């Protein structure tokens, strides 16, 4: 299956929490091993574990993570807030490849998640078309990029 088809699942997962994650973005993530989804998750609401954490924790055989690909709709965070950085968990679990729907323009992230992953040897790929992922979080992006509500 292509990265584009797999990334569509991220959008589906993220939409499960529509209207409940503010001020955080909607994010879906899952993990593929040998072409099969072995774990998935989404960010349920602010202050709770992020999608990447939910996906990683849902994997029944964690030893498979070291030969798996993580797909996520948004660049993994790289800062400490109410939860620790997802990029740190990804490298701690030795996930070798991450495919991202779109980058996160939040000043706390904005390339830092990708930078952390790459500096730890993780192969990072982006969706060929980030538009559906940006549209998913247009309210979040408007607030972060223009410092105003989405109208």
Positions of PLM-derived features:
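Zinc-dependent deaminase
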Residues: 1-20, 62, 81-151
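Acidic helix/loop or adjacent segment enriched in Glu/Asp that either coordinates divalent metal
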Residues: 3, 43-59
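Acidic, glycine-enriched active-site microenvironments
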Residues: 24-27, 68
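Short beta-strand scaffold segments in enzyme catalytic cores
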Residues: 27-35
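Local cysteine-cluster metal-coordination motifs and their immediate loop/turn environment
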Residues: 42, 49-50, 70-91
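Phosphate-handling active-site elements
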Residues: 60-67
């Amino acid at each position: 299956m292509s990265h584009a088809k797999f990334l569509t699942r991220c959008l589906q997962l993220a939409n499960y929490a529509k209207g409940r994650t503010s001020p955080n973005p909607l994010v879906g993530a899952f993990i593929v091993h040998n072409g099969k989804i072995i774990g998935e998750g989404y960010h349920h609401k602010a202050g709770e574990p992020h999608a990447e954490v939910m996906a990683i924790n849902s994997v029944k055989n964690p030893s498979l993570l070291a030969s798996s690909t993580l797909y996520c709709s948004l660049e993994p965070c790289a800062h400490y807030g109410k939860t620790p950085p997802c990029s740190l968990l990804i490298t701690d679990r030795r996930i070798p490849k991450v495919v991202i729907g779109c980058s996160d323009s939040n000043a706390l992230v904005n390339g830092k998640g990708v930078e952390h992953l790459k500096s730890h040897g993780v192969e990072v790929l982006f969706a060929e078309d980030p538009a559906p992922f940006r549209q998913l979080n247009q309210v979040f992006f408007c607030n972060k990029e223009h410092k105003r509500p989405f109208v």
